[in-house]
Amino acid sequence: KTFVPAIAVDRIIVSGLEDPGPAYFISDGEAVTKFIDLAKDVYSFVTLKAEPKVNGTQMNVKVSGHAGTNEMPLQTDLRLTTWLVEDNITSKQQEGKDTYIQNGVLRAVLSKNAWGDALDISGYDFEKNYSVTIKPEWNVKNMRVVSFVNNYDMNVERRTIYNTTQAPCMDPTGIYEQPTTANNNILSVVNGKILMSKGWQLVNVYDIS
């Protein structure tokens, strides 16, 4: 069964829904909010940090973490999956506007394969190091490393993502303008909650003059 639009968060399985999961049909904005809140209530037993460093055309990435337990819930084959993605890629499309901005385009799988590297948390702390050559057509200023601890299993219902992290490949050089118009679909308010594609933080500004 194929359907769009659909949403999947941490590959969690929600009982009582028509769709088999881990992707579910989006009926309305309220359903999205409830689904995200449900995923947020799942406790994570592992922390994760990605540290990319660029030197010319070479990028080295260190991913480290700490597990609060030596085995994750329902673990069968624990993996650490690390990808290199690029945002703000302009491409053509068939209908609507002439161009479309693609975010999260997969540029490289830093792990041995797309399902990740075997991860041993019996010692609680762990670390993986990766290296990749930056291709000329990549814009490293728009790239980020995405890494997540997940379970792999032949059964799609047992591929839970336990925690994830991301880090820009290059440090930002300053504050940039974030579009907030409805057409850009970057910021949405559903039932009084702010939903943004790249996350958000509240900032208070005070005039102390």
Language-model segments: residues:
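C-terminal outer-membrane/trafficking sorting elements
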Residues: Y176-S209
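Short, conserved sequence motifs used for protein processing/export or organelle targeting and
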Residues: K1-T173
